């Protein structure tokens, strides 16, 4: 062994980079020589300063490397630089990028320093891996033979650091500056490499294409855990490593490691800032290959394509080679560490010990990481690539377990690999692309695996898919094409809208109504069948007018037997509004209660009566005269005859008994509406007055025959003050509150409208009184003292007529003045009280204006231009401004006319 030690001594002295020596020893096979290799490793460790074996004065210069190459028949450094056509280099500009979770990209030094180091270190590793197995007698012969084999092999040119050589069974991977990224259980590779790959050289299409795939992965897992005995687990733990090799401040690279790496952090070795990690369980070196570096952007798509073309022809040869390697591992400890250097062309689709390529639970869920996916440990910097590469499908832990969706994943992978990589990269941006090659008949939920120890049991079967469509769009409500359920789905047939709450659970032909994937991914694509259920078009709803604003939504919750005989209620149409002769537009079915008008017989009549028993007030009556100025014909309508009054009282009876189809013999025309199954009489100008009373009393109408007599008495009396019947209970308390408020306003409106009565000229003369200067018309209440106010202070003519309150209310002033406001009647802060109408005022001038304008009909203010009279001076002043503007306009027109005449002349 003297010559063996001499060779180690000479190699360690001639190397300027001790990290390559350390890597060469760490990559050796574990076996009976493990203790010897550990001693040699400790001798050449930089932490021991190499004081035991290396004499610093005897280290040669870099110019002596050529002699070393010539001694072992190895080409010089310049020749290997010329042979390497394409070298993948990193970009140091990414070092300034901030990474999440304190994880920085581990970048190599400059390009000029990295390239000689790669070529030098790689061939020294090739040479040093074979040294411990050389005998003293056969040392030089084996060395010359192997070096000549290396020189004759054209595949020895390495394109990328960290690649696998296919001609050697030893681990030839170079370790980068990052710590190993492993999980306690063995982490396997993914079948899809980086989606955002860029092909920069034609060199990638050659033989070592597979080598770049390992740079795109996370780590090289080891499968030696089950092949080593517990005694080897205990004896192989390196306890002699220096403890000062833990993560320290001298390490410029911030690292993130898993649970297994943190436990072994105290025993890690650093050689020139590089981390060499020794896995205590697998007993050979595992290096973390950067997935977040620039190397992950190169040549992944073409590599996938080359692997896809070669995998079918090489499948049998790879399986045979794997069996031979497994048999050799049991007999010779020399081949123990060669298990990780299997031919790596099977990692795309075949089941190998390195790469278990079982697909995920469903090929549709391409945007969702699985349980053992490395993406959940934040392996890459999120700023490097688009989010589609962060959600690639990963693989299962178990070798021989069949995948759940293996048939579809195999079929989809038989296409062009470059197109597969492209479509998977945009499958999360365009969610419908994930359904492109899936069969629609196999959308049932996946069956859980039978093994209880499977990590798939920890996954929930209905995990949420974070798709863009689920944010901006809702799930389309399918329309059932079954004829038996078509009537129950469409609520408003006229408008074409669909009430989604009342839709029954429709049976789907494929049986996937409970499948959560189908509900989210149910939007049809261009390759899906034409007969799939499409989302219904949105029909433009008609504008809701002022009178239908308070209409409650219609809820059709009827059994199927009732649906067969009753038709849904259509919305308001323009031809259903009644236009009176005076221009007053009113709606007569604004309460929202549907009427069931059919001719089915007695059963339908009973249903119609029960439906209309829940009455609501006529809220549209509050807006009866909004926005319309009343003219003289409306202000002084003619009286209503007794015959028309009786006909109006009989209307609810006839509509309740005949289902809204009865008619009368009045002078008006009969129109059938949807308001409480009653008919509306279109009045002629002679019966215009009764139309107002009809709207006032229509809120109390009922189609129930049991309540017809009480309603008849209620409508017949003028002093009817009873509240309307309570409306049906609704689901919203806010709607109930608003209805109560509107009902109270409606009651006050009915009080005022029910008291309207026509007076003749003789009756008005009898009711009014001629005032005198001594007649007290108002009193002032201040501190309990009543002060009388006479007419002399009001500046009224001596023959002024004073009208009572009833006539004032009947007057129907054109402007909205506060005639019966309760606050004016009960506010004690207003001390001036009118004895006629009991209204209070704060100032005496207000009382005078009120009395003169309302109680007297006197208009003392006259316009000198048009001789129009006004009851108030401010109204006269406002009127005079109109005349002033007209005069100014005439003057301006006259001036422009004179100017035009001068110009023409």
Curated annotation (Swiss-Prot):
Gene3D superfamilies referenced in this protein's UniProt entry, alphabetically: Classic Zinc Finger (3.30.160.60)
Biased composition, class Polar residues, residue ranges:
1-29, 584-598
InterPro entries documented for this protein: STE12_transcription_factor, Znf_C2H2_sf, Znf_C2H2_type
Protein's UniProt keywords contain Chaperone: no
Q: Which Pfam families match?
A: zf-C2H2
The terms under GO molecular function for this entry are:
cis-regulatory region sequence-specific DNA binding; DNA-binding transcription factor activity, RNA polymerase II-specific; zinc ion binding
Domain of life of the organism in this record? Eukaryota
Biased composition of type Low complexity is found at 312-334, 439-460, 647-669, 690-710
Q: Where do the record's region annotations for Disordered lie?
A: 1-34, 312-340, 383-419, 434-460, 525-544, 584-613, 625-671, 685-733, 885-905
UniProt key word Lipid biosynthesis:
no
Among the GO biological process terms of this entry, one is: response to starvation
Subcellular location as annotated: Nucleus
Q: Where are the zinc fingers (C2H2-type)?
A: 832-855, 861-883
Gene Ontology cellular-component terms listed: nucleus
Keywords, in A-Z order: Activator, DNA-binding, Metal-binding, Nucleus, Repeat, Transcription, Transcription regulation, Zinc, Zinc-finger
Q: What does this protein do?
A: Transcription factor that activates stress response genes via SLE (STRE-like) elements. Required for adaptation to weak acid stress such as acetic acid stress, but seems not involved in the response to heat, osmotic, ethanol, nutrient, oxidative, or heavy-metal stress. Activates a subset of the genes that are repressed by NRG1.
Protein name in the entry? Transcriptional regulator MNL1
**Native species of this protein?**
Candida albicans (strain SC5314 / ATCC MYA-2876)
